[in-house]
Every structure is written in C-alpha cells, then in structure tokens.
Amino acid sequence: MSQLKNISKPCLRTKWKFFDREKSSSFEYFNLCEELIAVGEFLLAHDVAKTGLNYHKNDKKLCQRAAHALCKAGSPKTASRMLEQLVAGGDCGVETHSLLASAYKDLWEDSTDQDSKKKYAELAIARYGEGFFTNSYDNLKASQRKELETQYYPCINISFMYFFSDDLEGAKEYAEKARKICEKLKSGGKNEYWVQATE
C-alpha cells in the first residue's frame, strides 16, 4: 500500500499544478484535498483548501478540510482556531465539533503541564459531546447507518477522554453507548473492524 501512496504523490502534485483554480467547483477542491490527505500530503492539502476558499468563500467543507489537514500535519493549535471560527459562525455539525475535539485531543496529548492537559481534555470532551448530541443516538433507527457511524466517533472519543481523565464512570457510560451504536450498525449489516473491536 505504501508503494501506491508514493506513486500517487507526484501525480497529485502534478494534478494540483494544472488544476484550474478559477473554474473548479468547491466539490473539486474538496476531492483533491481528500486525495492529498489520503496519501499524507497534509500541507499541500491545506494549501489546496485555502486556495479553494479564495474562490468559494465560507465553504464549510473546505474550511473543515483545511483544518483537518493542518491537524494531521501537526498544527492542532492553528487548526483549532480555524474550527472555533466555524463554530462561532453557527456551524453546529457533528463533523466540525468532532474535528475541533480532535484538535483539542491532540493539544491534550502534546501538553506537558497538568493544567493544560486538564483544560484541553475538558474542551475535547465538551466538543465531542456537542457532536454526539447533535443527533440523539437513542432516536436513531438501525436503518440510519450513516448517522449511526457519525455518532460513533464522538461517542467513543468521549469515553476515551473520560478514561484518561480518570473519570471511569463517564468512560463506562459512553463506552456502553458506543457499544449500543455498534449493535445497531451490526444488525443493519455493518461489520467493519471497528464495530467488532468495540463490541
């Protein structure tokens, strides 16, 4: 697989070199960002998203990709500022909250003093919580697979953050919710590794 990634990097750089920046849709910018992120070209993916935002102002998905690429490149602080602006602008979606929580989680992991660790753990839990409660998992039907998958990510991460913040009751509560989500996914035919691992 790594050989395939190495082969595609030059092709993607060439694709960006000849990319029609003025006429391309936000969807085309987004797709190129996704391709670049998939092969580890995080800084170039960020540049693509930022360029796309010059032509497609306030495109939520491009903002998310720019921040996600920065986070992957090791700049969670800058990524968190971008995502905080999205939230302040009214974006209450699961994806934005989860990306922001993930940036806070990275800052928590990178922190060396206990005050910073506590602060970023609390921020991550709060944002994962916002993402999780955007759609109450209790109201989701097994047939709503995509929504269930979307709910799983913030839910299991709340459990993770509670566990490493020594709140074992909170960790257990959200681990159980994540397990129930996986049961619903499995009953709907979803049988990926992370569903089995959670159960």
Model-inferred region functions:
Residues 50, 84, 105, 109, ...:
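Alpha-helical repeat scaffolds in large eukaryotic proteins
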Residues 18-24, 41-42, 46-58:
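Internal amphipathic alpha-helical repeat/solenoid segments
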Residues 2-13, 34-47, 69-84, 115-129, ...:
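Helix-turn-helix repeat elements of alpha-solenoid scaffolds
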Residues 42, 139, 183-186:
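Long, compositionally biased charged/polar accessory segments in the mid-to-C-terminal portions
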Residues 1-6, 10-13, 20-34, 56-72, ...:
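Amphipathic alpha-helical repeat scaffolds of TPR domains
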Residues 172-199:
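Alpha-helical protein-protein interaction modules
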Residues 18, 52, 85-86, 131, ...:
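Canonical positions in the second alpha-helix
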